[in-house]
């Protein structure tokens, strides 16, 4: 996957215990684990796991780039929101 493994679109936070359990799993096996256990540790992870193809080639890399763009757009929109002031 090269440098694409470090893209924001390919990253999500997981607990230290999950990281320990899955540290030696391939990306495909990690996805299989989360899909089979119907477990997601964050909304971003759930979205990532919903893609059929995810990886370094073809549609997989296109999906990583698309997800990254969508997440960055969402963060920018949230940042630009005007929040009401508290009294």
UniProtKB/Swiss-Prot annotation:
Record's protein name: Uncharacterized protein YfjM
Gene expressing this chain: yfjM
